[in-house]
Amino acid sequence: MPKETRSFAVLGLGGFGSTVALELARFGNRVIGADLDERKVSRMVPHLHSAIILDATDEAAMREAGIDRYDVALVAIGRDIKASILATMNLRLLGVGTIWSKASDRTHHRILSKLGADRVILPEQEMGRHSAQMLHNPAVQDYVSLGNGFSVVNIIVPEKLDGEAVSALAIGSENDIRLLG
């Protein structure tokens, strides 16, 4: 059964926003990208369902652009904290079902959370933690934090364990470790 696609509005087409928008579109989702910068919008036109010049601080302009008809919105406005806050507030007022917002620091994070963002992202801190985990342990190829202290980790199996039966490894006997295959 094919995966159901959703529609996404990405407000702010800088490095972070444009990367998210392009990936969502690559997955087959309907994506509108919006930014005040005409050059950023122009670069996205060939790749997205729609790309528009839009002031996300203007609730009426967002409604006119049909942002309220999208399932999920991402506020990826980076440098202008006031614009980020107003865009998040406008999305909530428009009734967008799910709102993710990018924050620049902890205070910004708290404000966006209080405004009703469903998830607030601190990309530099999150990527910094991710990089530190992988640098700390060279056997870790990649990992995903699941929250509450749980992670899925992709590790390089040492040569000495090559060919060993999984049952002989005593995985989980001392730690709460589970093998996924």
What positions do the PLM features span?
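N-terminal Rossmann-fold NAD(P) dinucleotide-binding loop
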Residues: G17-S18
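Short beta-strand element of Class I
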Residues: R30-I32, I99
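Phosphate-bearing ligand-interacting subdomains
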Residues: S42-S131, L135-N137, I156
